[in-house]
Amino acid sequence: MLERRQGSGTYVLSLGGGSAIADYFAAANNRDLIELRQTLEVTAAGLAAQRRDEDDIEQLRALLVRRNELWAPRHVEPHNVEEAISTDIAVHRAVVAASHNALYLELYDSLLGLMDHYMRGNPIGAECSFEHEHTRLVESVIAGDIGGATSATERLFTELGLSRDQPGRNFPHHPHD
C-alpha cells in the first residue's frame, strides 16, 4: 500500500502481495531480483526523462531530499530505518512512475516486498547511501536527459556492486515450499 503525502511524495506503507506473480517473485533470489530491477529501472529512467511532468518533478525532488537526509548519518537511527528504506524505494518507484508506463509500474510494484526484504539485509547509512548516484539519476530525469538518466541508473547498480555475476542468495519466504 502506498501513501501520498502532499509536498513530500509517495511512501510505501505495506507490502501486500496477493497475486500469482507476487508469489512467484517471493521465491526469487537476490541476483534474480537485481537483474530484473536493473533491466526495468534503466529503461524506465530513460522513459521518465522523456515523459515526466511537473507533478513527477515535484515528487522526485521532495523524495530525493528526504531520502538523502535519512541516509546521511553514518548509521541510521533504528527509529528511522523504516522510513529510510521506504523513502529509498519510493525514489526508485517515482522514477518508474514518471515513465508513465502502467505495465512497468505494475511489475515494479509487484517487486516492492522483495526490495524491502533485500534492503533490510544490507547496511543502511552514509557509507552505503550512494547519494551522488541517486541525485544524478533524479536530476537527469528532471532535466529530460535520457542518456544521463539511463547511465546514472546503470552507474548506481554498478556502484552497489550488484553485478549479474554476483551469487544469488535466496529470500527466506518460499510460499510453494
Give the location of each predicted region.
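Short linear motifs at protein or domain termini
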Residues: 1-46, 50, 169-177
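Short helix-coil transition/hinge motifs at the ends and kinks of transmembrane helices
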Residues: 19-24, 73-80
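Residue-level detector of well-ordered alpha-helical segments, enriched
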Residues: 36, 40, 56-59, 83, ...
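Amphipathic alpha-helical segments enriched in hydrophobic/aromatic residues interleaved with Lys/Arg
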Residues: 56-74
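C-terminal all-alpha effector/ligand-binding and dimerization domain
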Residues: 65-68, 83-87, 109-177
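Short basic (Lys/Arg) and small-residue
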Residues: 95
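Short loop-to-helix capping motifs
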Residues: 99-102, 144-145
